[in-house]
Amino acid sequence: MSTDLNAATPPQAPLGRFDGRVQFDEWVRLSLRVAAAEGWRELVLCEADFHGWPLGDREMLETLNQWAGGSRAGGARKCIVLCANFESVRLRFPRFVQWRTRWEHLLDCRQISVRNAADVPSVLWSQRWMMQRVDVERSRGIASDDVQFCVEWREKLGEWITSRSRPGFPATILGL
């Protein structure tokens, strides 16, 4: 009788450097599985237009459902989504748009005001861990659980949240 050791091993957030779209996608999915499993209370997703993120991926949305659903049992959860171009998100990721509607009470979507989209950081942040795409075009970057690194990035993201963005990407669009 064989046993699957991986089934008993909880996922761990990836650390170090990543290189390429495939690895970036894998690390985003894995980090969100860890967020769901460990009950991370706050997430910040920041990107100019989320092109190159696996936001339309069924597996990722199921993981986001698990993370969001944990708010019932494990305390309040919050996800801040910072984006310069939500119209691109709306067109490219209809499944994510539907997910956003279901969990609107946990999401704070903010429209970034910026002249150059390249100035917007590409970051997935939590209090315990974060990942930054330093080279968006080639999907290269770093993931770290260093406390100081996470604190510094929370301060940078706080600046974007409070001074350089406004509420955006409503869950429903009301019309006449």
Label each PLM-derived region with a short phrase.
Residues 1-44, 48-176:
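PLD/PLD-like phosphodiesterase catalytic module centered on the HKD motif
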